């Protein structure tokens, strides 16, 4: 299986004046096409920091992050942004949808950043994916008019609309009750499997983690046996 993402010897140190904190230490990780990986670990173990680095939203203090054979940390912000838009989808615990835009407009947004995609095409693709997450009756609703589970479905649709090869998800069901979390995760799994998208998910929920192909435990910034 080919590697979509490869991180080697990742170290992250936050420097705040006199105090410096090493958050990640010598981490390696390879994600191959279509696989589902769950990262678990106690609060403060570095899970979100790692996801940020892997998604090119921040740079490691040392080490390398390769996405589709290209070294992210040698790129400038514009180049990293283009790589994110082309290859990655992001889902967060709190949906990060834009309050003043409808479901369709929120989902179409990543496509509208691509000059080759017309507004009409972006809108149609947004409608198609919103249909596949069961929100055909909520297309013109704004986030404030949707339930928590529905908002998370919109966020999933937005992450998948560009057909990314990898979804980075930080507690994607963390603010939902048990039933909603199961249903939203079920939907996410079904779509990523149909679309052959890999999934790297941070979760506190070991039951959810058990559904992934591979589980990784982060403790104090390094891997431990799960
Ligand atoms: N920008 C920053 N500047 C300084 N320290 C930071 C910064 N971001 C995170 N940290 C510190 O890095 C450590 C790891 O944080 P991180 O958010 O990655 O943990 P986490 O495992 O995702 O925790 P949680 O499960 O609570 O979300 C924490 O001690 C945090 O205070």
From Swiss-Prot:
Q: Which organism is it from?
A: Psychrobacter cryohalolentis (strain ATCC BAA-1226 / DSM 17306 / VKM B-2378 / K5)
Identify this protein by name. Answer: Lipoprotein-releasing system ATP-binding protein LolD
Q: Does the keyword Transport apply?
A: yes
Q: Where in the cell is it found?
A: Cell inner membrane
Residues where ATP binds? 41-48
Its primary localisation, in coarse terms, equals membrane
Q: What is its EC number?
A: 7.6.2.-
Q: Does the keyword Protease apply?
A: no
Residue ranges of domain ABC transporter in the record: 5-226
């Amino acid at each position: 299986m080919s590697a979509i993402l490869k991180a080697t010897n990742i170290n992250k140190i936050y420097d705040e004046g006199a105090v410096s904190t090493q958050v990640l230490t010598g981490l390696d990780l390879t994600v191959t096409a279509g696989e589902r990986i769950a990262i678990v670990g106690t609060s403060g173990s570095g899970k979100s920091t790692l996801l940020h680095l892997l998604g090119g939203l921040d740079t490691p203090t040392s080490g390398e992050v390769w996405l589709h054979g290209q070294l992210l940390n040698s790129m400038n912000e514009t180049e990293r942004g283009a790589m994110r838009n082309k290859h990655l989808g992001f889902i967060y615990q709190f949906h990060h949808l834009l309050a003043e835009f409808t479901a369709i407009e929120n989902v179409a947004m990543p496509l509208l950043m691509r000059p080759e995609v017309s507004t009409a095409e972006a809108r149609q693709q947004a409608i198609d994916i919103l249909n596949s997450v069961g929100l055909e009756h909520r297309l013109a609703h704004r986030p404030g008019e949707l339930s928590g589970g529905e908002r998370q479905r919109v966020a999933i649709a937005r992450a998948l609309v560009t057909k990314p090869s990898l979804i980075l998800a930080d507690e994607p069901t963390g603010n939902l009750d048990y039933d909603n979390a199961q249903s939203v995760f079920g939907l996410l799994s079904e779509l990523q499997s149909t679309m052959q998208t890999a999934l790297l998910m941070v979760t506190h929920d070991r039951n959810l983690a058990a559904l992934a192909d591979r589980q990784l435990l982060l403790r104090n910034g390094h891997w431990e046996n799960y």
